[in-house]
C-alpha cells in the first residue's frame, strides 16, 4: 500500500508548485506547473482504433464483468473500473416504472476531456485510442476525475493515483480479451479494432448503425463505447434514478 514515504522528487516538486498555484491561482497559470520533461507517447499503433460495443439486449446484470475486472486489475475494495448499474426510469405521462441495466466504464473518447486538464501529462491517449494513466507521473490531484462526464474515474486510495478502465490493455497486447469481455455470461461485450472492416465490432456497428447510441453525445467527446439497445432516457442527458447494483446488499 502506498504510504507517501517514497514519493519521488519530481512529484514532491510538483505538489509544492501546486500549493503555490493554489495560493495565487489568479497570477500563475496552471500549465506552468509541470514535471521537468514532457514524456514521449508511443504506445499503441495508429493503424488500430480499439472500441467496445455493449449489446444491452444480452446483458443480464450478473456483474460477472465487475467481479472479473476487480480480480484482474486488483482495484481497492469499493472501487470499480466497470460495473453494471440498475436504474428506474419513469416515462413521461405514465405511472409505470421500468428497471434498466446500464454497464458503465471509461468511454475512451476521441476527445477525452480528462487529458488536457492533467497538469503533469499523466493521463494521455495512446495512438490506438485507448486512454491510460501513467502512475509514475500522476500526483492524485483528481482534476481528471472531475473532468470526466461519465463518472468513470476515481482516485485509488492505495496508489494515490487516478484509476480507470484501460480496456485491459495489458491483455489486448498479449492477444487476450479484456477480463470483462471474456467473463460476460451473455456475450454482451464486444471489443475490437474498428479500423479493421472485417472485425466483429466493425461489422456489428455497420449492421446496426441506425440503432447504435452513445452516452452524452452532446458533450462532443466522441465516446468509443457504443451501446445497442440503449434506452433513449440515457442518451441526452443521462437520466433516471440510479439504484444499487444487483450484487449489492440493499
From Swiss-Prot:
Q: Which domain of life is it from?
A: Bacteria
* UniProt keywords, alphabetically: 4Fe-4S, Cell inner membrane, Cell membrane, Electron transport, Iron, Iron-sulfur, Membrane, Metal-binding, Periplasm, Repeat, Signal, Transport
Location relative to the cell: Periplasm; Cell inner membrane
Would you tell me the Gene Ontology cellular component terms?
periplasmic space; plasma membrane
PROSITE patterns in UniProt: 4FE4S_FER_1, 4FE4S_FER_2, TAT
The entry marks the following residues as binding [4Fe-4S] cluster 4, namely: 118, 138, 141, 144
PTM annotation: Predicted to be exported by the Tat system. The position of the signal peptide cleavage has not been experimentally proven.
Question: How is this protein induced?
Answer: Transcriptionally regulated by Fnr and by the TtrR/TtrS two-component regulatory system.
Q: Where does [4Fe-4S] cluster 3 bind?
A: 106, 109, 114, 148
Q: Which Gene3D superfamilies match?
A: 3.30.70.20
List ligand-binding residues for [4Fe-4S] cluster 2.
69, 165, 168, 180
Regions annotated as coiled coil: none
The answer on whether this UniProt entry bears the keyword Flavoprotein reads no
Topological type in the membrane: Peripheral membrane protein
Task: Please state every residue range assigned to the domain named 4Fe-4S ferredoxin-type.
Answer: 50-79, 97-128, 129-158
Any Pfam family hit: Fer4_11
- Give the binding site residues for [4Fe-4S] cluster 1: 59, 62, 65, 184
Q: What GO MF annotations does this protein's record show?
A: 4 iron, 4 sulfur cluster binding; metal ion binding
Q: Which residues form the signal peptide?
A: 1-33
**Record InterPro entries:** 4Fe4S_Fe-S-bd, 4Fe4S_Fe_S_CS, DsrO-like, ET_IronSulfur_Cluster-Binding, TAT_signal
Quaternary state and partners of this protein?
A: Probably composed of three subunits: TtrA, TtrB and TtrC.
Per the entry, what this protein does is: Part of a membrane-bound tetrathionate reductase that catalyzes the reduction of tetrathionate to thiosulfate. TtrB is probably involved in transfer of electrons from TtrC to TtrA. During mice infection, the ability to use tetrathionate as an electron acceptor is a growth advantage for S.typhimurium over the competing microbiota in the lumen of the inflamed gut.
Protein name (record): Tetrathionate reductase subunit B
Task: Look up and give the organism this protein is from.
Answer: Salmonella typhimurium (strain LT2 / SGSC1412 / ATCC 700720)
What gene codes for this chain?
ttrB
